A protein has these predicted regions:
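GST-like domain detector, emphasizing the conserved glutathione-binding G-site
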Residues: 1-119, 126
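Amphipathic alpha-helical packing segments from all-alpha helical-bundle domains
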Residues: 120-138
């Protein structure tokens, strides 16, 4: 059985959602980033991590792709043009849109208050709007 390491209100939810979609049982070990529990699975303390037998995998997108490939579901076959297009869109979403959302989160609640720059949010909103148009054009 898989083991998912990470808080529910984190990117660990992506992994748990993927496992639910695949119909795969899993154990959830709730813990926050940089916690002692998280560091047992990833020395940096970043979450999520997935334990599959003796293997520990990290990074939510890599974990989801691993699971899709392992179970031959929810993805195009590796080495096909369809998979290359899927990967291109996935990586673009992570690089462009998720990065903007993460920057907004850091300046809203992740960083200590004295490190937050609230003024950045207007530029992030504008960049997200441009990326949304770009996404619409891609689809």
């Amino acid at each position: 059985m898989y083991k998912v390491i990470g808080a529910t209100k984190s990117r660990a939810m992506r992994v748990m959602w993927m496992l639910e979609e695949l119909g795969q049982p899993y154990e959830h070990v709730p813990c926050g980033p940089r916690s002692d529990a998280a560091k047992q699975y990833n020395p940096s303390g970043k979450i999520p991590a997935l334990v599959d037998g003796d293997e520990v995998l990290t990074d939510s997108v890599a974990i989801m792709q691993y699971l899709a490939d392992k179970h031959s579901a929810l993805t195009a076959p590796a080495g096909t043009p369809a998979r290359a297009r899927q990967d291109a869109l996935t990586f673009w979403l992570i690089d462009e849109m998720d990065a903007i959302l993460w920057a907004a989160a850091k300046h809203s609640f992740v960083f200590p208050e004295e490190q937050r720059v609230p003024e950045i949010k207007d530029s992030l909103k504008a960049e997200f709007a441009r990326s949304a148009v770009n996404l619409s054009d891609r689809l």
